[in-house]
Amino acid sequence: MDLESESSVLESVEDNNGLIGDLDKELNSPVETSPLISKGFGLRKWKRRLRRDLVKDDTSVSMENSKALKRVLSGLVDPNAKQMHLPGPEVRQDSVGSVGSVNSVVGFVMGGESYGNGLAFAAGVDSDNSEDRSSTMSHSWDKHRGKVSGGKSVISSGDSSQQRKSSVEKSNKLRGERIKIEKENSHSSMESADSRSSNFVFMQGASYSLSSREQGGRRMMDYDDENSDHDAHTSKRKDNVEEEEEETEDYSQGDCVEESQIKSNGSSDNLDPLIVAVNSFQTLQEALQKELQKFQELGKEEPITSLHDGGESSSCIHAGHEGASEASSSYRFGSEKMGEMELTSLDSEILNLVNNVEHLEIKLEEAKRILEVKETQIRELESTINVSETCNGGTEIGIEDIFQQKVEAEIEYIIFSRSVGNLKRRIKLIEEEKTLGLSKLDKAETKAENLKNQAQDLQNHCVEITEIQEVECLKKRAFKTTRCLLLQLGLLFILYYSLLPEPEIAVPT
């Protein structure tokens, strides 16, 4: 069993040699491969045993496939192992199962890219087509830099934490870009469908997509039944993988699968049936526009008809929008019965276009009739206007004379008003001069009165001065007379005392 497991692993590695070579060129990390063991009875081809009795649901099979891919890819990103070594017998059996699960999931991814390429992709079988499969897988897995080496672990030289962070960041970026692309595609498809689609086109696209999905689902069921043995065998290895590695590998797997689906949808021959239906409807719409342009060229002389025709065409387009919304709802909630109307959709669409053209022709005729009626009304109005102009010729002359008189009166009024204004200004100046003269007279009178008062004051002062001088003279005379009298009295007393006899005084001895 050991030799058989080793030989099966080595053979699967040889089948996937192209894929491993491309990934090794990307990673630029040295990987040591285990040498060939030539002991025993030689290498035997590993064959897959199919269990037809075991049946599973689509969801369980897809979940087991994703879990198996997580476990295998988590083993591929292990940074601690630096060499490839041969494990024990139990581990070898698990590795064989893991290789089968990897190849089965790879087949699932390639089948999801286009239904025409097939869903059954098995390792160890169809060795001639292994190079083509490996090249397509390397192209789809090129951006994510998956590290695969046939069931054994491929080791990079960087740190594990940095690798995990970088892988998580890359997966998040790719997921964001994928979501943006899906939103843009959905918005663009819905806008084009709303503006240019009809019920039958969407019914055709829905039926075609449903039939293709049913076929792909049947193929996936058959392929999952074939891989059920290996999925059941590989489901026992849950406890050997950490949660972080499972999340990162899950993100990278989903992004890789969806990116490969986007690429295959852009490049494969089996295009989206909705896009094909929309393109066919665009061609039909262009043909209808050309016919409408021809009708417009025929009716260039009547512009109102073209306007009316545009209104009717806009109403038809509005009806087409409503039909597009109904078609989108039928596309979403359609059933398998829509597949029966694929062949009759184009015929019914052509009939609808013919009916629309006939309806537009009827509307054109009605618009022409309305135009004729309006032209007659316009002619009647022009005739009435001419009659009114002839009657109103004399009144216009009188109105002109009155207008001239009015203008002259206004000019005279302006002149008189200006002259009156000038006179008023002059009167104001004269009055101001009078007031200035009166103010000057008042000032002169006040000055004269002041001078008179000053003269009177001087006279009074002079009188007072003379009176004071006279009083002083009288005072001087009185002072002289009193002084003379006092001198005379003093002399008399002196003479009197000198004439008196001296008294006799007893002098003691």
From Swiss-Prot:
It comes from the Eukaryota. It is found in: Nucleus envelope; Nucleus membrane. Residues 166-186, 229-240 have a biased composition (Basic and acidic residues). Expressed in seedlings, roots, stems, leaves, and flowers. Residues 1-11, 150-165 have a biased composition (Low complexity). Residues 241-256 have a biased composition (Acidic residues). GO terms for molecular function: protein heterodimerization activity; protein homodimerization activity. The chain crosses the membrane at residues 485-505. Mediates and enhances the nuclear envelope docking of RANGAP proteins mediated by WIT1 and WIT2 in the undifferentiated cells of root tips. As component of the SUN-WIP-WIT2-KAKU1 complex, mediates the transfer of cytoplasmic forces to the nuclear envelope (NE), leading to nuclear shape changes. This is WPP domain-interacting protein 2. The gene is WIP2.
